[in-house]
Swiss-Prot record:
Protein name per UniProt: tRNA dimethylallyltransferase
Documented EC number(s): 2.5.1.75
GO molecular function: ATP binding; tRNA dimethylallyltransferase activity
Name of the top EC class for this enzyme: transferase
Cross-referenced InterPro entries: Dimethylallyltransferase, IPT, P-loop_NTPase
Keyword Magnesium: yes
Catalytic activity: adenosine(37) in tRNA + dimethylallyl diphosphate = N(6)-dimethylallyladenosine(37) in tRNA + diphosphate
Amino acid sequence: MDNVLVIIGPTASGKTKLAIEIAKRANGEIISADSMQIYKYMDIGTAKPDEEEKEGIKHYLIDEVTPDEEFSVARFKELALKYIDEILSKGKLPIVAGGTGLYINSLIYNLEFSDTICDWELRKKLEQEAKEKGNEYLHNKLKEIDPKAAEKIHMNNVKRVIRAIEVYTYTKKPISVHQEESRKNPPRHNFILIGITMDREKLYDRINKRVDLMLEKGLVKEVEKLVEMGYDKSTIAMQGLGYKEILSYLRGERSLDEAVEILKRDTRRYAKRQMTWFRKIENVYWINKDEFDSDEKIIKNLKYYLATFGIFL
């Protein structure tokens, strides 16, 4: 099987930077596994690399759809596999980098997702319930039918909560059972996993600084522009981190300082959930950034590890 490198880790840990450094040395191209970077017009709040930061390395699954378009895990897997084959056909190394756990799992475990199970009426009804009764009410509904899925899916991830309820309603089988059964499928490629970790307080400090930098770069203007384009609170992408908080400020629901503090807090919580998710993945070669005083030393460490798979940096 062909090698595919996968770089995982919490938000603000430096996945993209490491992926670019490896791609430059190993003749690679990068596939983003980030559920927010797929959206056009949302650049600052999703921390997309700009052209200068990409350093000439081709990136896939960035700016794939507009903010009001549906983009499922099944669609991610389909496109990611297509781009992996495309990169391999050029004799290059595919590098998947991102922090969306379900996207990563869909590839490394070759999970099967049925997009054919779809009930628009039920979906609209559940969306309305979430608006009227709150996210927690809907999450409790999921808890009753699929406690395992409820444990993994955050109550604010309304889209995934609804999807899990929808699958159970149609199949009478919890989505967690579907996922466990589909894990028996052999993976399509030899996925080599590298994980980035660091001291929690250092990571939280990086997150706080990243949010401040987003504000400096013009996050408020970016959200204002999206609102002008017709994207509002009901748009799926606008419920993402960095957008819902600034939107609440623009709607006069809280001050900018409050919105920023909530964004920092919720991003830290998200990073914690990401690490909990990634720690459950087996055969990850973990890089603790605290043990290295430069990126060059991290590359040197990886050089010996990746050489065992025939990947030379």
